[in-house]
């Protein structure tokens, strides 16, 4: 009976009423195969988990790699991040910001610096601006590279192309460029 209660408690902890069944099944598989706990509301796409991880509520991981024994707090948005072992990522940490051109002209509207005909039906894009990279990648091929045993505080924003070394501590509210 005790074992059954334990199993039901763990299932309830990751169950999300608004979550499609396929996410629930993925979370169950991750838990039993790699001891990865993904709380309700957490989502991931094209993300690799090494195992023994915890992803808290409402966090989103896309195109990322999470090494062993790393922890993601609630409300994080991690796009293209490689996270090392034994990392603690605080709440509301964001990665994967795209850049806007500022050298030859300044624009915030996507249609001026990227071909948007498929999305909007029109585009003002005339070709790649020299020296402009919309997404800057690190040497590992990810947008953000976080080393081993790193502690990142709450409300941190990490820009594209940043590598954070092993053992680093990033203060709460920091913008890492």
Question: What do the PLM-derived regions correspond to, one by one?
Answer:
Residues 158-165, 174-177:
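Beta-rich strand-turn-strand
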Residues 171:
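Active-site Tyr-X1-5-Lys
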Residues 1-149, 155-156:
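Domain-scale signature associated with acetyltransferase and cell-envelope carbohydrate enzymes
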């Amino acid at each position: 009976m005790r074992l059954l209660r334990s199993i039901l408690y763990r299932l309830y902890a990751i169950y999300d009423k608004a979550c499609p069944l396929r996410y629930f099944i993925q979370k169950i598989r991750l838990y039993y195969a790699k001891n990865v706990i993904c709380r309700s509301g957490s989502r991931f796409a094209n993300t690799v988990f090494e195992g023994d991880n915890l992803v808290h509520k409402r966090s989103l991981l896309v195109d990322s790699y999470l090494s062993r024994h790393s922890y993601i707090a609630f409300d994080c948005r991690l796009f293209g991040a490689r996270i090392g072992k034994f990392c603690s990522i605080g709440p509301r940490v964001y990665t994967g910001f795209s850049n806007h051109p500022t050298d030859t002209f300044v624009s915030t509207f996507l249609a001026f610096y990227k071909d948007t005909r498929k999305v909007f039906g029109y585009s003002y894009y005339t070709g790649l601006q020299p020296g402009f990279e919309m997404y800057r990648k690190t040497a590992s091929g990810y947008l953000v590279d976080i080393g081993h045993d790193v502690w990142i505080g709450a409300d941190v924003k990490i820009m594209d192309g940043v590598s954070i070394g092993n053992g680093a501590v990033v203060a709460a509210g920091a913008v890492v460029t």
